[in-house]
C-alpha cells in the first residue's frame, strides 16, 4: 500500500498526515502558479476540496481511497503498524 499526498508549502496538516500515515508516501507540492499542477488544482476545485492535503491511497496501483484535509479516521484506517501491517 502506498500514498500520494498533494500538499501546499508550509502545510502542517500535510506534514502531520504524512508522518502519521507512516506508509510508502510520495509528497507532491501543489502551487496555483505552477502550471504542471493545474490538473490537480482543477480536480480539487471541481470536487469542492478547499483544503490541503489531498491524499490518495493506492494498493497495487489501484486507487483505494481519497480525501482532503486532515482526517484522523482515514489516517488511522490506513496507517502502518510497527509490524508492517495496515489497520
What do these predicted ranges mean?
Residues 12-13, 35, 73:
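Short alpha-helical
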Residues 23, 42, 46, 73, ...:
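Charged/polar, solvent-exposed surface patches and flexible loops
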Residues 28-30:
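Gly/Gly-Pro-rich "capping" loops immediately C-terminal to redox-active cysteine motifs
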Residues 32-50, 80-82:
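Thioredoxin-like thiol-disulfide oxidoreductase module
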Residues 57-86:
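Non-catalytic, surface beta->alpha helical segment in thiol-disulfide oxidoreductase systems
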Residues 1-26:
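Local sequence-structure signature of Cys/Sec-based thiol-disulfide redox active-site neighborhoods
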Amino acid at each position: 500500500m502506498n500514498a500520494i499526498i498533494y500538499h501546499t508549502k508550509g502545510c502542517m496538516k500535510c506534514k502531520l498526515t504524512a508522518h502519521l500515515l507512516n506508509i510508502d508516501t510520495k509528497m507532491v507540492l501543489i502551487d496555483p502558479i505552477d502550471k504542471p499542477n493545474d490538473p490537480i488544482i482543477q480536480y480539487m476545485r471541481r470536487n469542492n476540496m478547499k483544503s490541503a492535503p489531498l491524499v490518495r491511497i493506492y494498493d497495487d496501483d489501484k486507487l483505494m481511497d481519497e480525501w482532503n484535509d486532515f482526517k484522523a479516521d482515514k489516517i488511522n484506517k490506513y496507517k502502518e503498524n510497527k509490524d508492517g501491517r495496515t489497520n
